[in-house]
């Protein structure tokens, strides 16, 4: 199973491929490609997937009016999903799920494919009006839909329509004939914004990810408790070479600028893509900060045991937390006082070559593999380390994501007297191979360019 899940696709490249092959219309957009794992036909598979959201800004200018923006173009539809390690004979993704309505080539249930809440849903809409919503393109015509979910706030009364007319600065709820007693308004539809409205005291991970659980599309956000007052703990902002970690990472930058020296994987915020239902599942029951919030808001949090087994199977170790822990461990793996004082064994996060041959810090990545002495393959988040100002690999850390092992960090160190090539050295060896370098030179001609993949 480890070899069957070696990743051939990079999410940046796959995102543009999804957009080209599966957006199907100009007003559909894939915001991001997420990586998850599913048991499909008895096999544990690593899968890349993305939600097909509706981007109203891409609607043709002649069709952009109040009715279309607020009443008709209300939701995206379905997703694209493909295995990390397969391509077709044309070199394209071998889709597990594709098209509209969704067509699945594996045993995966999609009972509700509509996306009213997502990462691209940045404006408010009305449902339950007298006009049918655009559902998806169907041949020369369009399929329509009437929202029947529990999401949204009822505005059936004149008083409520008046309040929201004032709130949104539009008289349409009062002057339009489209509204009925069943009408609803949906706002705070962006999942990050929605979660922040409910739990502003949790620091949310920068990468909400999509999961298909119990036949429905779910957005999962990792929620942290943070503090700048933990005794004898070094703030993230004072760690060695922290600027390399923070580059292009606004969430981590905000965390560092606030003086954070305490962070815990406190909760998972789960938002249903169809009705916007938000559940907050507690992860770390021993976190004193979370425990305090639970006492203040006793009805806000849900015990982890209440989540369905299928939903829990998609929880993973948080990205930003792993980045912070890896950053701090560069120095704090040293347990000899003198060695630590002199910073003799300081590690760094490795460099890798990216697009346009630019060099940047390697990001953690997800794999399915069997750890030494483990019973079987599991979903891991891993990151290698190199010595400071050197490129050979000295260790790699793994965060376990599955079942009872969730949250365990495992470090594997290599003998200091043995050379183990690091990512940048492997890139150099690739460039030094005459056959490969010749192909790279050929492909980089006549306006074409080679995109270097993630190692």
Regions found by a protein language model. Name each.
Residues 1-455:
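Soluble extracytoplasmic regions of secretory-pathway and membrane proteins
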């Amino acid at each position: 199973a480890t070899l069957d899940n070696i990743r051939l696709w990079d999410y940046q490249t796959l995102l543009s491929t999804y957009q080209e092959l599966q957006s199907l219309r100009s007003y559909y957009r894939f915001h991001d490609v997420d990586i998850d794992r599913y048991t499909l036909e008895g096999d544990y598979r690593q899968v890349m997937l993305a939600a097909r959201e509706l981007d109203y800004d891409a609607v043709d200018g002649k069709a952009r009016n109040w009715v279309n923006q607020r009443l008709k173009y209300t939701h995206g539809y379905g997703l694209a999903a493909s295995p990390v390690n397969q391509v077709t004979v044309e070199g394209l993704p071998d889709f597990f799920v594709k098209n509209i309505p969704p067509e699945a080539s594996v045993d995966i249930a999609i009972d509700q494919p509509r996306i009213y809440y997502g990462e691209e849903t940045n404006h408010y809409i009305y449902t339950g009006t007298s006009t049918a919503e655009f559902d998806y393109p169907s041949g020369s015509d369009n399929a329509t839909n009437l929202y029947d979910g529990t999401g949204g706030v009822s505005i059936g009364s004149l008083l409520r329509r008046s309040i929201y007319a004032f709130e949104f600065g539009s008289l349409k709820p009062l002057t339009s004939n489209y509204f009925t007693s069943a009408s609803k308004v949906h706002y705070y539809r962006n999942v990050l914004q929605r979660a922040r409205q409910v739990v502003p005291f949790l620091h949310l991970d920068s990468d909400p990810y999509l999961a298909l659980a119990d036949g429905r599309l779910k957005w999962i956000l990792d929620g942290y408790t943070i503090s700048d007052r933990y005794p004898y703990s070094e703030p993230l902002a004072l760690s060695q070479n922290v600027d390399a970690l923070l580059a292009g990472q606004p969430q981590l930058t905000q965390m560092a600028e606030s003086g954070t020296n305490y962070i815990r994987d406190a909760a998972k915020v789960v938002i249903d893509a169809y009705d916007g239902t938000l559940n907050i599942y507690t992860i770390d029951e021993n976190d004193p900060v979370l425990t305090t919030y639970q006492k203040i808001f006793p009805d806000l949090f849900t015990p982890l045991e209440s989540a369905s087994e299928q939903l829990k199977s998609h929880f993973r170790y948080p990205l930003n937390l792993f980045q912070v822990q890896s950053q701090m461990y560069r120095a704090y793996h040293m347990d000899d006082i003198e060695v630590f004082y002199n910073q003799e064994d300081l590690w760094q996060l490795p460099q890798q070559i990216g697009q346009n041959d630019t060099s940047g810090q390697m990001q953690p990545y997800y794999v399915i593999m069997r750890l030494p002495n483990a019973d079987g393959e599991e979903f891991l988040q891993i990151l290698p380390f190199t010595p400071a100002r050197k490129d050979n690999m000295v260790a790699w850390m793994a965060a376990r994501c599955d079942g009872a092992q969730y949250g365990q960090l495992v470090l594997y160190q290599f003998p200091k007297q043995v050379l183990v090539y690091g990512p940048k050295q492997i890139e150099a060896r690739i460039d030094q191979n005459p056959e490969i370098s010749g192909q790279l030179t050929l492909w980089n001609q006549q306006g074409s360019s080679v995109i270097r993949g993630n190692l």
